[in-house]
């Protein structure tokens, strides 16, 4: 079952779903919009392939600021301004807001697992021309779905509780 605006407001009021900070215009007809945070990680142009066991920091450049340009065909990691917490019976689908999608920006299919909490780090793929995006701009739309029963194994992975843009983590 997809949660509509009335459902979402109720879940937020009961604190079953947490979105912090929550702005008045964030709750939409069938989801919640998330805003651009103040940090981005750009993929470095390196001449060697990444292999598990290598330090992912060697492949990214982090930037902090209030506006970012996503260059043509560039892939970046962006973080949401909001911290999200989901219960064990709610998951979310992440989509690019249509205004940015119409500019050619893309996000890969992404799911937020039931039980997740943290700021979202999302890959954004650039368009055919540069696009400037400012901190605080609504850029993602989350569609929330209720599972029939609470999940047996809620998310407790390595990205649980993440804050700021989080580059890939590999464990042995």
UniProtKB/Swiss-Prot annotation:
Keywords: Hydrolase, Nucleotide metabolism, Nucleotide-binding
Entries under Pfam families matching the protein: DCD
Catalytic activity: dCTP + H2O + H(+) = dUTP + NH4(+)
Pathway: Pyrimidine metabolism; dUMP biosynthesis; dUMP from dCTP (dUTP route): step 1/2
Active-site residues per Swiss-Prot or TrEMBL entry: 123
MF terms in GO: dCTP deaminase activity; nucleotide binding
Subunit structure: Homotrimer.
EC number(s) recorded for this UniProt protein: 3.5.4.13
Binding site for dCTP: 97-102, 113, 155, 162
Enzyme class: hydrolase
GO terms (BP aspect): dUMP biosynthetic process; dUTP biosynthetic process
Record's signal peptide: none
Name of the gene encoding the protein in the UniProt record: dcd
Gene3D superfamilies per record: 2.70.40.10
Organism: Metallosphaera sedula (strain ATCC 51363 / DSM 5348 / JCM 9185 / NBRC 15509 / TH2)
PANTHER family for this protein: DCTP DEAMINASE
Protein family per UniProt: Belongs to the dCTP deaminase family.
Purpose of the protein: Catalyzes the deamination of dCTP to dUTP.
Protein name in UniProt: dCTP deaminase
